[in-house]
Amino acid sequence: MRLAAASNEAYAASLAVSELLSCHQCGGDRGQDEELGIRIPRPLGHGPSRFIPEKEMLQVGSEDAQMHALFADSFAALGRLDNITLVMVFHPQYLESFLKTQHYLLQMDGPLPLHYRHYIGIMAAARHQCSYLVNLHVSDFLHVGGDPKWLNGLENAPQKLQNLGELNKVLAHRPWLITKEHIEGLLKAEEHSWSLAELVHAVVLLTHYHSLASFTFGCGISPEIHCDGGHTFRPPSVSNYCICDITNGNHSVDEMQVNSAGNASVSDSFFEVEALMEKMRQLQECREEEEASQEEMASRFEMEKRESMFVFSSDDDEVTPARDVSRHFEDTSYGYKDFSRHGMHVPTFRVQDYCWEDHGYSLVNRLYPDVGQLIDEKFHIAYNLTYNTMAMHKDVDTSMLRRAIWNYIHCMFGIRYDDYDYGEINQLLDRSFKVYIKTVVCTPEKVTKRMYDSFWRQFKHSEKVHVNLLLIEARMQAELLYALRAITRYMT
């Protein structure tokens, strides 16, 4: 009997300790592992994005079969549910297409071996100093049997991959300078030469990861908890803090102050939305009343192209790449320069002469079957995606605005649509929005939360993520057009 009583007392004491250490909301234990000498990492950020408060992230209910299927597919393909996926899920139709395309590029049958694919992803992401993507693909590269020595620097990779460095550099920062000579140098490099099919696969991977770096910075994607910069071993500052508090809105004081400060300008941002709606209505009326001549539209394109040179942010300083990223590429000083620099003449790229639908799509599909169709589907979803809403307004036709954003990006790259009136861009896109667009597309490593917050202040975060989807797909298409045109010229 005494043994039974002692056992009951020990059990009761154990329950009392567990009660003290457990969280009443999630049932988890606090501190027990630390007492056992185990260092437990804690996430540094609150949720998958530094720009979007976690309480405003899309919550997936247990009844949402489509979302759960997407998450399951992502986890099965990548072995993880990364923060990019958790932000893109605002737009499930796009996310499904994105995951399908990325899975095909990285894991399905194709011209390049698996470890080459991940290494090219590392090279592309490193050009924009995107340590988030570099870290993810370093893990994937090693997982598929890649040689760890290659990760010590590009000079330790095979000469064939080193030769790709020049194309990676120009494609990432000044794609309009790509010529058929770049292509010829890769295809005729003796024992280190690329086949046409391999090169198309590499080009698609490079453009995919240049653009994904833009999304990563543009949405302020936080590092995964297991990656550098994603965790800390310091104890929380509040003794009764639990990890479940993150999902309950227990954010830092600074974040709450930022949110309250943002509310002060609600009335101003409300009028911005109304003004944009009115401009769209007026432009639609003008379209119906009169149409500009071809000469006038060509003149407006040149004017917009020149004006885009003077769009830059006050934070437009050089960003020195960290050693752990810069070792994956050469010529670290090479970066973006405006298409229309003084003393430098580059002919305008006319979509009428070479376009994705009539030329690029068929070339990619011929040399890398099925990929052209996947990319084309992704372009169309991003371009046509709409919920017919603008901030608090419903039943709005946003096609005019989406086209202005897409064509402005292509204009910055010197790409012109003969049937588009570029005068609409200045009417629809204000300076703060142009600064954000140009930074995300051309120098994404310089994007700040202030830039993200300063444009379309009354719009929902899901709408800003939608903008970023437009930006990255327009950028990817622009890069592909220049690279594929050079390949076509080499072939003919």
UniProtKB/Swiss-Prot annotation:
Disruption phenotype: Triple knockout mice lacking Sesn1, Sesn2 and Sesn3 do not display an embryonic lethal phenotype since they are born at an expected Mendelian ratio. Moreover, they are not distinguishable from their wild-type littermates. However, their survival at 10 days is dramatically affected. This is associated with a constitutive activation of TORC1 signaling in the liver, heart and skeletal muscle during postnatal fasting, that occurs between birth and suckling. This is Sestrin-1. It catalyses: a hydroperoxide + L-cysteinyl-[protein] = S-hydroxy-L-cysteinyl-[protein] + an alcohol. Keywords: Cytoplasm, Nucleus, Oxidoreductase, Phosphoprotein. Residues 321-492 are annotated as: C-terminal domain. Its EC number is 1.11.1.-. One of its GO terms (cellular component) is fibrillar center. The gene is Sesn1. L-leucine binds at T386, Y387, N388, T389, T398, E463. Residues 71-252 are annotated as: N-terminal domain. Belongs to the sestrin family. Functions as an intracellular leucine sensor that negatively regulates the TORC1 signaling pathway through the GATOR complex. In absence of leucine, binds the GATOR subcomplex GATOR2 and prevents TORC1 signaling. Binding of leucine to SESN2 disrupts its interaction with GATOR2 thereby activating the TORC1 signaling pathway. This stress-inducible metabolic regulator may also play a role in protection against oxidative and genotoxic stresses. Highly expressed in heart and also detected in liver and skeletal muscles (at protein level). GO terms for biological process: cellular oxidant detoxification; cellular response to amino acid starvation; cellular response to amino acid stimulus; cellular response to glucose starvation; negative regulation of cell growth; negative regulation of TORC1 signaling; reactive oxygen species metabolic process; regulation of phosphatidylinositol 3-kinase/protein kinase B signal transduction. GO terms for molecular function: L-leucine binding; oxidoreductase activity. Interacts with the GATOR2 complex which is composed of MIOS, SEC13, SEH1L, WDR24 and WDR59; the interaction is negatively regulated by leucine. Interacts with RRAGA, RRAGB, RRAGC and RRAGD; may function as a guanine nucleotide dissociation inhibitor for RRAGs and regulate them. Interacts with KEAP1, RBX1 and SQSTM1; in the SQSTM1-dependent autophagic degradation of KEAP1. May interact with PRDX1. Gene3D superfamilies: AhpD-like (1.20.1290.10). The modification Phosphoserine is found at S293, S314. The active site is at C130 (cysteine sulfenic acid (-soh) intermediate). It is an enzyme of class 1 (oxidoreductase). It is found in: Nucleus; Cytoplasm.
